[in-house]
Design a protein with these regions (language model features):
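Active-site hotspot residues in diverse enzymes, especially metal/ion-binding acidic/histidine motifs
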Residues: 2-395
Length: 395
């Protein structure tokens, strides 16, 4: 419920607007992001000649210009602070209240991204509830006591795409929509190449049925992340993380859950090629690091060459020294690809690619529109379609 009470004051010859805000909502965000009001004040006063004070942010009434600056930090929309409905930091409201430690040290942008998808998920759940439709719960439930390799092979029929595409992006799209058949939301977000702060995560699983993916220059990396997060989903183990293959190769410490999900993802994607891959005895300079066979497996399974070499190191079939040489070469190839993409985007004006939209998300919005819960403008905006193209979703 929004009161939208406001006053106008004259300051330094200018008329400024003050608005009544719900301080409880600022407290909620500070709790969510593990910040204090002093932390908030420090961020607000960065690069400012005249700083704000605690009294400026603690009052019932707040300068609208200050409120907009606060929202530049949290990015939830100004209307959020003008809403006086009750809100409290409960475990049911956010993964940040259910977990205190994550697989990565999350930066502010990573937290903002995850929170935005949590807010979206709450909307989608409300659409189904208002439509009086219950979404079936996932039928598969695994534990880390289950063998990850055997488990991956068993669930492939449910979650692996039927029509295997050759191109990595097409495969990723089919993979996302295969999960949609099991009522799992997959949301992909795309960051612009020239953005000031980038989210330092690759993916996240937020229970009970939402996976978030960061668009990567390498779709193979994104595919592996999706398979990894599917493992979290089947274990019912929430996580927000960046996947670090070199650290795995170096024997970096992993939790039992992370190791299980990595093994699950690798086996899930390799499928019947796994036994053939296991026949590789060693990879070093005497056999050109098995480049031809690695290229073959990577092309056939959508598993990156780096992930395949990482597995060889973990299986003691490749030395860490040889791995670092190969990795340096792969990193150089990857960087050249990124530089070429940036150069191309600069020539085209910097247009960003669009995220893949899950069929489950489309179905949710179609249901909401059909039942009068959202309007046509909202439908077209979310799916990025023109009004005269809406009929395609209801054919």
């Amino acid at each position: 419920m929004s009161r939208k009470s406001c006053t106008f004051v004259r300051s330094n010859g200018r008329v400024a607007m003050n608005v009544e805000i719900n301080q409880q909502r600022i407290d909620y965000l500070l709790s969510l992001y593990k910040m204090t009001r002093d932390d908030l004040l420090t961020q607000l006063n960065e690069n400012r000649s005249r700083g704000y004070s605690l009294s400026d942010i603690n009052g019932k009434m707040m300068a609208f210009s200050l409120l907009k600056n606060i929202d530049k930090i949290f990015q939830v929309g100004v209307e959020y602070y003008l809403d006086f409905s009750a809100i409290s930091p409960k475990k049911s409201s956010s993964i940040f209240f259910r977990k205190t430690k994550f697989g990565s040290n999350l930066n502010m942008e990573a937290k903002r991204r995850v929170q935005s998808f949590e807010m979206l998920k709450s909307e989608l759940d409300a659409y189904w509830k208002l439509s009086d439709i219950s979404i079936p719960k996932l039928s598969v439930h695994l534990t880390i006591q289950d063998d990850p390799y055997q488990s991956a092979l068993k669930v492939r029929e449910l979650f692996y795409p039927r029509n295997v595409a050759k191109k990595d992006r097409d495969f990723l799209k089919e993979f996302i929509n295969k999960l949609a058949e099991q009522y799992i939301y997959v949301f992909e977000f795309v960051e612009t190449w020239n953005k000031k702060e980038l989210a330092n995560i690759d993916g996240a699983f937020i229970g009970p049925n939402m996976i978030v993916l960061k668009r990567q220059k390498s779709f193979k990396r994104e595919i592996f992340t999706l398979a990894h997060e599917l493992g979290h989903c089947l274990l019912r183990e929430e996580e927000i993380e960046a996947l670090d293959l070199p650290s795995m190769a170096a024997g970096g410490s992993l939790t039992a859950v992370e190791k299980w999900c990595n093994d699950f993802a690798f086996c899930f994607l390799m499928g019947d090629k796994l036994s053939e891959f296991d026949l590789i005895e060693h990879a070093d300079d005497t056999n050109d690091y098995e480049r031809d066979r690695i290229d073959y497996f990577s092309s056939a399974t959508h598993v990156s060459r780096l992930a395949l070499y990482t597995r060889l190191v973990m299986a003691h079939k490749m030395s860490n020294a040889h791995y670092q040489l190969v990795r340096a070469d792969l990193d150089a190839q990857y960087q050249r690809m990124i530089n070429a993409d940036i150069e191309q985007m600069e020539k085209k004006g910097g247009a960003s690619p669009q995220p893949i939209i899950s069929n489950f998300y489309k179905d949710t919005l179609c249901c909401a529109l059909y039942n009068g819960i959202i309007n046509e403008a909202k439908f077209c905006k979310e799916l990025r379609v023109k009004p005269d193209e809406m009929y395609k979703y209801f054919a």
